[in-house]
From Swiss-Prot:
Pumilio repeats lie at residues 96-131, 132-170, 260-303, 314-348, 349-385, 490-528, 529-566. Residues 1-41, 612-655 are annotated as: Disordered. One of its GO terms (molecular function) is RNA binding. Keywords: Nucleus, Repeat, Ribosome biogenesis, rRNA processing. GO terms for cellular component: 90S preribosome; nucleolus; nucleus; preribosome, small subunit precursor. This is Nucleolar protein 9.
Length: 655
């Protein structure tokens, strides 16, 4: 047998090292040989991209794919509401999908069509489609497009389950030709089929990149929570009614994880990028279970992780990991939000002396917000006393959300508002920039529009966190609100117009105009500043809301209302035919003012308050009682007794 040829050099030595490394495959990457990935309870991983290998269900024909591409465009352009045409279109799509549900779910165009199809479907159609996936739930949630389509389907199945649990009968819809017989099953039965199929694979799916998003929502559905999807990828979670067997199923999985996994393994899951989402669901469900029991005790899972009395939280390294880790901090947020009040003092011992450093930390500040919402009056005072020592940098960008939460809690408890305002004013004064509190907190800057690089004009950009803090200041006492109003009047007209036309800062102006007891002197000065610019504001998205708020704010100022509506009428077609301007014209009845001003004045009179302007001014000390003959409200009649006293002669009696 010939000897193996010897080789040397950097090229061959590097190749030899690579072969040695490949011979020892890491646990997260499947070895690429025969039988790799065929073990039960494991999924295949691409050795080159380190991404999970997705199951393959088949592919659509070019004609079928073109059909779903056209169906997606039809949904966007025409079939957006419930009507007869939409019903026929939905039924035709279900006939096309029948028999190839898995393939359509995992297609880029088919999944988008399904996401728009489910909200317009009947309960029978939803259950028929869901039952067609039976036996393939585990594989489907491991695919890119199928996982998103299944999330939407699960949300609609939860809505059907809620109705069936409450005893609401579904409409007797016509069964489509060839429709699955499982449509006559209840949503509870169909969902239990899915749970029983997924349960043996939970440990494998917890670390799957695509499956964890669906798996977390599945566990929360067991506990009675449904995710509602809105436009713009926004989701909200609402409580629903579920059968009694659902929470017990979730409790059994959590108890199994608590008993079979030791503490280091559970903590490793908490800081894992994907498994932490499932751990958050487990912790939330475990807290819900403990609240339902008569004997209040800490959940077993959370006690094993962190809250056991055996642990010294101040010296526990895992506590520091949760505070500073981007993934683990979300776990700690759920714990702080739901833990019993007896643990607040233990956490206070951990945070004492570190409040400022944790509040300005880019990750720990989210935990501090949750913690501050749980504190009482005494603890809030201790936090503020510690923060007073660092008032120079208290308006830092990373500190603004904590400052807003602190002010919100102070408004709720009606305490320490003066201290917070004094800290903010001191920090603004020491910043060395503009002494006005509004531009300082908004961190106003002029930047070029990235969406339109050719446009060299710079647009105003404001900080959202600072705007939220300023909006929270509007819920404080009158003397604090007056400081904010004075800061608005100190701005130039150009600055105020820029703030009105910018999306973030316009909400602050709306909040000011929406105040129930707004100072009439400030309102007149502010409207005088905006005079001549209402037509410009009406044709912009942020400014149109401000013009609409001005209608309510000027209820007691008919002269200012007339000026504004006249200015809108003089705007002509530029305002009338603009997308936002026509809505403003409709709210202000501009067309009625053009055609029949007398009728518009009568319409305005109907909206006038019973309390007159000078009565509101008297509340602010502007008019002294008895200093003028006009202090008497116009709506009241003179007293007859006073008239009799003023008469010089006796009454004439008719005989």
């Amino acid at each position: 047998m010939p000897k193996k040829r010897k080789t040397r050099g950097k090229k061959h030595s590097a190749k030899q090292k690579e072969e040695e490394v490949n011979s020892v495959v890491s646990p997260g990457i499947a070895k690429n040989d025969e039988g790799a990935g065929n073990d039960e309870g494991a999924y295949q991983v691409n050795r080159y991209t380190n991404e999970p290998v997705q199951p393959f269900f088949g592919a659509l024909d070019p004609e079928e794919e073109k059909y779903f591409q056209q169906a997606e465009q039809a949904f966007a352009n025409h079939f957006t509401r419930e009507n007869e045409d939409t019903r026929f279109f939905v039924d035709s799509i279900y006939r096309e999908v029948q028999g190839k549900e898995l393939i359509v779910c995992n297609n880029v165009f088919g999944s988008k069509v399904l996401e728009k199809l489910f909200p317009l479907s009947t309960s029978r159609q939803i259950k028929s489609f869901f039952s067609a996936l039976n036996g393939h739930y585990v594989e489907l949630i491991q695919t890119t497009f199928g996982s998103y389509a299944f999330e939407k389907l699960l949300s609609h199945m939860a809505a059907i389950l809620n109705l069936e649990t409450q005893g609401v009968t579904e409409d007797q819809d016509d069964v489509l030709e060839g429709e699955n017989e499982n449509v006559f099953m209840t949503a509870e039965t169909l969902l239990m089929y899915m749970y029983n199929e997924i349960r043996p694979e939970v440990s494998m799916l917890m670390s799957h990149k695509l499956a964890v998003h669906v798996l977390g929502k599945i566990f929360l559905l067991l506990d009675g929570y449904r995710f509602v999807y809105h436009d713009g990828n926004r989701t909200t979670m609402e409580s629903i009614s579920v059968p009694e067997s659902f929470p017990q199923f979730a409790y059994s999985i959590i108890d199994s994880a608590t008993d079979n996994l030791d503490t280091p393994e559970l903590r490793a899951y908490c800081v894992d990028k994907y498994a932490s989402q499932i751990m958050r669901a487990f912790i939330r469900i475990d807290f819900e279970r403990s609240k339902k029991t008569k004997k209040k005790h800490d959940p077993r899972l959370v006690s094993k992780l962190l809250l056991s009395n055996e642990y010294d939280l101040k010296e526990l390294p895992f506590m520091e990991t949760l505070l500073k880790d981007e993934t683990g901090s979300r776990i700690l947020e759920v714990i702080v939000e739901n833990m019993s009040a007896s643990h607040l003092l233990r956490f206070y011992a951990v945070f004492e002396g570190r409040f400022y450093r944790l509040c300005v930390h880019p990750i720990a500040n989210f935990i501090m917000q949750r913690y501050i919402r749980r504190l009482g009056r005494k603890e809030i005072g201790s936090v503020i006393d510690e923060l007073k020592k660092n008032t120079d940098n208290i308006i830092r960008k990373s500190f603004l959300p904590v400052l807003r939460t602190l002010l919100e809690k102070s408004n709720h408890l009606h305490c320490y508002q003066d201290d917070i305002f004094s800290m903010i004013q001191t920090s603004v004064t020491n910043s060395g920039k503009d002494a006005n509190i509004i531009p300082c907190l908004l961190r106003s800057k002029h930047k070029r529009d990235k969406a339109n690089p050719e446009n060299k004009e710079r647009k105003l950009v404001n900080n959202l966190l600072g705007a939220q803090l300023l909006e929270e200041m509007l819920h404080c006492e009158k003397q604090h609100i007056q400081l904010l109003l004075d800061s608005v009047l100190d701005l130039s007209k150009e600055q105020i117009l820029e703030y009105c036309l910018e999306t973030v800062s316009s909400h602050l102006i709306e909040g000011i105009l929406d105040l129930s007891d707004l100072n009439p002197v400030f309102l007149k000065k502010f409207l005088n500043i905006l005079s001549g610019s209402f037509a410009t504001l009406a044709v912009s998205a942020p400014g149109s809301h401000i013009v609409d708020k001005a209608w309510k704010a000027t209820r007691a100022l008919p002269l200012y209302r007339t000026r504004i509506v006249r200015e809108l009428a003089e705007g002509g077609d530029d305002v009338k035919f603009d997308f936002y301007g026509k809505k403003v014209c409709s709210n202000w009845k501009v067309e009625l003012f053009r055609r029949a001003p007398d009728e518009w004045y009568r319409f305005m009179k109907q909206d006038e308050p019973s309390k007159r302007v000078h009565e509101r001014a008297r509340q602010y000390g502007r008019i002294v009682s008895g200093s003028s003959a006009n202090t008497q409200p116009l709506g009241e009649k003179r007293s007859t007794e006073n008239d009799e006293e003023l008469e010089s002669g006796p009454k004439r009696v008719k005989v």
